[in-house]
Amino acid sequence: MKLSRILLTLTILLTPFVYSKDLTFASPEEAGMSSDRLSRIKPAMQRFIDEGKTIGIQTIIARNGKIVHFEHLGKLNLETGAKIKSDSLFRIYSMTKPIVTTAAMILFEEGALLLDDPVEKYLPEFKDKKVLIDGALVDATHPFTIRELMSHTAGLTYGIFGNSPIDQQYRRAMFGENHVFNFENVAANGSSSRIKTLEDLVTAIGPIPLQYQPGTQWVYSLSVDILGAIIEKISNKTLDV
């Protein structure tokens, strides 16, 4: 896939985050782009709606701090019939991962962090971690790093996709002692998690042992959330818009 297509795909998916008050509108030509080519986007997106592949789409393209294309088609909600508007909000789930990782790499380019920095340097809640192996707690071979957060190899887990002793501790920390997690219930009613901020998350799972030695396994985890907490700490800004 060409880089331009990848960037366009990300632009479509990440609309709520790139549409910032810091951007201004301009003609495509002012930003070195083609009005003719950009005009092909709307009918292409409309076809997805007409073919029943999605109920609505919002697209935005910006270059050099100027928005040159911003359109919304279709509905936001089938049940209510609400249409997508310029300020509609979207739940994008794991598409926050490229946003968070990009923000971290910007800080890396600015010299604010190093990929092999230990996470405990920024979040002392993760200092002197233990690892639960065969029911016994052992010392971690090394403090897990920002690089390992980015690659899901830090020793963390997610808490809701498995039932290991560490997963169970995550669930108790995030949802309470007797909570039974259910994806359908979350989709219908929202999460009942007691975690409201990234700082809450760090405080909750910081004391919990690692599930495996850092750098030895790939396990889908809350590592990108922890990366977000580091970004907040370094930048002194909240991660959300």
Task: Please name every model-derived segment.
Residues 84-88, 184-187, 206-214, 223-226:
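Flexible glycine/proline-enriched surface loops and loop-helix/loop-strand junctions
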Residues 91-95, 109-165, 207-209, 219-222, ...:
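Active-site helix/loop module of the DD-peptidase/beta-lactamase fold
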Residues 39-46, 65-67, 88-119, 224-235:
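Active-site SXXK
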Residues 7-16:
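Bacterial N-terminal signal peptides
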Residues 1-7:
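Bacterial N-terminal signal peptides that target proteins for export
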